[in-house]
């Protein structure tokens, strides 16, 4: 709900055409995308819970029946239904984040050329890739075994036209292209806050994608870049 609130505030004050005439306006929309990770109901499923659900569905964690308020019980028991919040909310949350990123990427040409525009584009591409990487792992089969199976819907613009699911392979091709471009655009960026995607974070996302593909050469290269200039426990 944080994204909706922040985006609605912007739209109350500015038209869609005027908000993207400055990097400051585009930055506000980008902050709205980040809000999906931190605020509101869907944030639990698009960020906080995605790290726990795979663990409880594997052998890495168990659900404590005492004081747990029934959380993660259905993933733990493999009893998730199509209408379950564990099924629906990650989809809604990730595509809402993707929609914010698409709004920025659709309007980049209206922004003056600058290093700030490059950073905003890079962060938007990396965020969108992060969301798609989670979606493809949750709602599709592994790329190394089922590349031609249905993946997820690759919505790359703000258009609301219905489109079919792309193949798993095509989804990974898109993610690789986007995250490689993001790594280039974010070269040399840094942030005093750990809340925003920087060059190292983009390389970390890329490393995970390449590992899924079994491309260990590129995976190792990006992982090393992600760890560069970062000390243990930093």
Where are these regions (language model features)?
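Inward-facing hydrophobic residues that define packing positions of alpha-helical scaffold repeats
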Residues: 30, 98-101, 172, 179, ...
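Conserved, well-structured interaction surfaces
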Residues: 68-138, 166, 184-188
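Hydrophobic-face positions in mid-chain alpha helices that act as interaction patches
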Residues: 61, 72-73, 214-234
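Short coil/linker segments at helix-helix boundaries
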Residues: 138-169, 173
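Single conserved hydrophobic/aromatic residue that forms the stacking wall/gate
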Residues: 1-5, 10
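Short coil/turn linking the two alpha-helices of tandem helical-hairpin repeats
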Residues: 136-143, 190-191, 212-215
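TPR/Sel1-like alpha-solenoid repeat signature
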Residues: 125, 203-210, 222
């Amino acid at each position: 709900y944080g994204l909706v609130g922040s985006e609605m505030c912007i739209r109350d004050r500015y038209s869609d055409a005027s908000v993207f005439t400055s990097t400051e306006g585009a930055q506000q929309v980008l902050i709205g995308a980040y809000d999906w990770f931190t605020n509101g109901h869907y944030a639990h499923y698009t960020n906080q819970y995605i790290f726990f659900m795979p663990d409880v569905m594997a052998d890495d964690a168990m659900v404590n029946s005492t004081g747990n308020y029934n959380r993660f019980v259905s993933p733990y028991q493999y009893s998730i239904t199509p209408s379950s919040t564990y099924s629906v909310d990650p989809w809604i949350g990730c595509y809402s984040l993707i929609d914010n990123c698409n709004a920025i990427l659709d309007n980049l040409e209206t922004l003056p050329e600058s290093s700030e525009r490059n950073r905003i584009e890079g962060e938007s591409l990396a965020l969108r890739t992060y969301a798609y990487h989670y979606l493809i792992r949750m709602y599709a089969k592994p790329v190394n075994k089922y590349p031609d199976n249905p993946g997820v819907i690759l919505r790359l613009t703000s258009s609301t036209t219905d489109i079919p699911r792309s193949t798993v392979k095509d989804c990974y091709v898109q993610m690789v292209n986007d995250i490689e471009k993001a790594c280039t655009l974010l070269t040399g960026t840094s942030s005093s806050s750990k809340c925003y995607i920087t060059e190292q974070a983009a390389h970390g996302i890329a490393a995970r994608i390449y590992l899924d593909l079994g491309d260990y050469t590129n995976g190792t290269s990006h992982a090393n870049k992600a760890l560069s200039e970062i000390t243990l426990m930093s």
